[in-house]
Amino acid sequence: MNNNNKIFQFKLVLLGEAAVGKSSLVLRFVRGHFLDYQESTIGAAFLAQTVCLNDTTVKFEIWDTAGQERYHTLAPMYYRGAQAAIVVYDIRSEDSFERAIKWVKELQRQGSPNIVIALAGNKLDLAAKRKVETAEAQQYAEENGLLFMETSAKTSQNVNELFVEIAKKLPKTPTTRPGSGRVAIAPIDNGNTGKKNKCCN
Amino acid sequence: MMKSDEGVSGNSNNNNNYKFKDNTFRKYGVEVVAYDNNNNNNNNNNNNDDNNTVTVNSRGFHISIHPFSFRNKLTINQNNGSIGGSSSSSSTSNSVSTPKPQSFYVDDAGIAKQLNQSVFDILSRSRYLSSLSHENLAEFIAAEPSQKHHDQMLIVSEDYKNSLEKQIEIQAKRQTPIPSNTIGRYAYQILKALSYLHSQDLTHRSLSLDNIKLDDNNQIKLTNYGLYYLSDHGENVSFPIGNLLYLSPESILRGAKGSSNTKADVWALGCILLHICLGYCIWQDNNPSIVTNRILHLSGYSTTQSFNSISKSFEQCELKKTIINEKQHEEYEEYDDDEDISEEEKEKRIKDIKLNNRDNMNNFINSLKREEKENSDSNSGSSNSNIGIGLNGLGKELIEIIEQCLIPNPMDRPDSETLLDHPYFNEYKNIDPYQLQWIIKPFTKSWDLPDSLESLTLKEIESYGHIGSDNNGGGGGGGGESDSDIYSGKEIYYFWKLLGGNIEKELVNKGFAKASPSVHKLPLYVPVKASLTESTNSGLNSPQPYQHQHHQHQHQHQHPNIIKSKNSTVYNNEFCLVELSNVFLKIKESFKLYGSKVFEEGIEQSNNNNNNRFNNIENNIELQIIIIREFHKLLYQYQYDDPTLSQPKIYRLAKLFVPPILRGDIWSSILGVNEREAKQLYNSINLDVKGPNDKQFELDIPRCHQYHPLLSSRQGHVQLFKILKAWSLLNLEKGCYWQGLDNVASPFLVHHFFNEPIAFASLKAFVDKYLSILYVPNNHAALSEIMLIYQQLLAYHDPELLNHLMDIQLDPNLYSIPWFITVFAHILPIDKLEILWDSILLCPSSLPNFIAASMIIQFRDSILKMNFEDGITMMSMIPSVDVHKCVSDALSMFNKTPLSTTVTKFVSNTDQELWWMQEVPFEKRKLELFPRIDIHDLINDQQKVILDIRTPLQFQQIHYPSSINVNPKLSKLQQQMEQYKGQQIVVIAPKDQGVDFTNQLIQWKFPFVSMLNGGMDSLEHGAHSLLIISNKN
């Protein structure tokens, strides 16, 4: 197997409740900086970054989505065709962990087959106010075959590590050629008819 | 001896120079009156230049800059030696249990400083102060952080050269004491101002002779009233606020920085009135320790100073027994800190503290009277004679008022409002034009007379006559039509800056800004073992470092327990007065240059033919002065008179120019906000109930436009929360909160800070106009529709760019949602957003679509070279857009685009015949790159190339004049069409056909391509008479 100098491109999506630090994780990973007050994301934001493994280079096309439940209808547009997903929660909030579990289920049901899902417990720098125990999340991740890490976008703890682990786990088959990670821009149907919308509860 | 000095007896001034304006937006400030003498020209030899006389009645109006250093709450983390924002347990800061993230910057000297919350909080509080308005308060104009010293704030305020302190000196020199009725009027006006401040929950705390100013009409103007509030009751500054000489006993007991309530100002007033009448300060010393002891002695404490009523002077004495002990002081502290205890409990506790001994004070005042009497009897030259009128010269009632002010126990001391009700002040009230304010109170069209009208005296009713009439009197040329306005201090300051004024430069020029690194700025006096008394340590533990530089002429004693540090900067009570004659001159010139008629004509012209008579207004100060005058009239008319009359005029003028200083008011009037209704609606919403989005607000608000000082302040967070919550409670049923509404609300909050009702009403009106279809539970269809219109506009104006975006699959879905769902408020910083919104508010609600198109076209050259990934990344560069260009491009696109392109064509329940007005599935319409237009747009503009792609036979039977029949299947179609490229092309196609042909034109980069909605059928239906019909049938 000779993958030297080969670049593999993957589409990765971030999901999770509002204000758990999705944008902050991406910005820490891509630009290496952190803002105390990151503007909320509306719709979605796109960023790209590469990760060098031993023998290959993995390029992530990252879709950072809006966390507010209202923007849920848009989410399928971004996770459709994604080979990887990071589902983020705030270790200080049990609600956000519950929401993360829902996202994982949705991805398992509606996401690409073989999608690599990572569960990230963010805001590790505020561990003093922790509400979600590491063991609990760890156990859930193991049961569901997810990668799991607790991260801090603020201190950058485990941020690169998380992306590297995902990169390692992604299959480097010849079919994943650059560009295949492009978003499928088919608007989602469930919002269109306007009759019954399951997403707004 | 009792001769009344002309400059002092102010009563007679009231009616002449104090015209009360009832027809202008601004109430207090610099008054300008222009008299147009053309109409009744008695003097035929009048030179043209002198046709109108302009008087600027500034009454000695000045602007002062007052720099003060605020405390940099720098916390140094000693664990790792680095400087960090969060305070750890070992941090030097003794406060903040929950660490709050802070950002730092490093200054030239490599010292990390906090770009801290205190700056933002001070700035947000300053907006409250600048919203105040009272005839006896000098207007608080602005607080601006110094660019040079990052721990310095510059307060810009209305100010006057003359003060009570100077007045006393002048009178002393002239050997004519200030007469009793003038002292009474001073007391009345100071009390009015204090009672206004107190009603706004503000305490002056540093009332003193030098910040009670007098304007040229000898009316009281209080200054420096904002510092105590601004610094969070002294928390944000490292110097004590308040002049010790006028500091109340309870303030002293609470320590240098302890909070004062409004009663402290009443004490200060008492001291000041006594000072004016005696001509000297009652404490007769300037040593902080001695003064402190004397104040406390008169308040009933046993201290090292006592007043000997026989020798009539204070004496040093042995302290026999300390009454104030630690325990009592603690009680006092408890009283301050513990908010949970009941009012009665508080009262009980404060009674325990022995402040209720009034003997010493009474004794003191009585001996003052006796001493005076003895002096005048013996006629011996006492050291203090002839400076003041003396206590015996005052009326009995005024002495009584002073005595009430000086009641040691704040619980017994009356508040300012009660004092103002004292019958003594009735004679001043009766001739006070401002007492009659209720007549023209805002929000009332007619005179809102009080119930007690019968009780008014004839004299009072007569005096109203002076108020309504504007055109008589004044210092002008008399007669003719007058054109007048009042410019507020903020506006004068704005003009001054437009004329090149810069407060930092001004300070340097006047020698105020002495550069010294802030680390050297230690308090002048550092309390080592601060104690209240010199001889015992049983006193208070609070520092008493009172010393004021403006008393430098007197000898300063060195307190043994206070160490003087070198290189220090203590609170500087100096104010830098700014010369404004250039501003006043400019205003005069403007009024002469643009008389009402000249200005009207100018607007007509510039509105009619877009000529450039009024171009470059941003740099045209004269024009801005006049435009602001016009807006004053219109905005006043809008709020208090007939809004339907003034709103179109506001539109017209705002299209010309929106002065930044009036932007908030102009916006809200364009949005149709009425102050009174806004308040009613806002107050009717119960914000105490739990709202459905409260949690989300709490997540979103702390990250909304946080670079903005007001929005990142605590006050800003609180107010934004209330506005959003009010909106969501009001829209519980149909509307709902989408993230981004916080961004939309922000500009309104910034303009109406501390005025939540107006900010809320403006937001509501804005959302109703631009966002109501999006702020619903399911907005997908509406959002898709908007993005489709945007995409079609882009195709219409820049087909090449659109083609490229489609080639690289950069769909509007992926980048433009935040644009439309917030009308750009999410993606642009507020200063840029304001420029966009100025136009958006004045134009039809389709303008945002044009703005979006012109915005992306600005980046076309880069985007055309980009692939998907670079293209989508490029979208994060949108905030760097040139908004002025964006607006002018969007407007010219708007003018070149048929109106019907952006209008929805569906009408529900239409006839089967009118198939073109029936709803077409979105999926089908989405395939159309081009916009559809209605027949009106085809008929009204003859400059179009009309391509009819029906069969030649159909064309022969019936066609639109000058239309061209084209076979869409022609082999060399592109070459054939090339001749029409660049012209407006309208395609007429048979039902359900022509999409491919028209799309093809766009793919060939033909701009301005549209399709006639309904084709020939709609023409036959709507414009049959215009068609050319073959007679063969």
Swiss-Prot record, chain A:
Listed PROSITE patterns: RAB
Localization (cell): Cell membrane; Endosome membrane
CDD domains attached to this UniProt entry: Rab5_related
Originating organism: Dictyostelium discoideum (Social amoeba)
Protein name: Ras-related protein Rab-5A
Family matches, as InterPro entries: P-loop_NTPase, Small_GTP-bd, Small_GTPase
Function recorded in the entry: Required for the fusion of plasma membranes and early endosomes.
Any one of the GO CC terms: endocytic vesicle
Superkingdom, taxonomy of origin: Eukaryota
Residues with lipid group (S-geranylgeranyl cysteine): C199, C200
Pfam families the UniProt entry points to: Ras
Sequence positions that bind GTP: 16-24, 35-41, 64-68, 122-125, 152-154
Modes of activity regulation: Regulated by guanine nucleotide exchange factors (GEFs) which promote the exchange of bound GDP for free GTP.
UniProtKB/Swiss-Prot annotation, chain B:
Domain of life: Eukaryota
A single GO molecular function term of this UniProt record: ATP binding
Keywords, alphabetical: ATP-binding, Nucleotide-binding
Basic residues composition-biased segments: 548-558
Binding site for ATP: Q78, N79, N80, G81, S82, I83, G84, G85, S86, K113
Region (Disordered): 1-21, 35-55, 81-101, 535-560
Positions of the Rab-GAP TBC domain: 657-844
Residue ranges with Low complexity bias: 36-52, 81-97
Entry text on domains: The protein kinase domain is predicted to be catalytically inactive.
Protein name: TBC domain-containing protein kinase-like protein
Organism: Dictyostelium discoideum
Gene: tbck
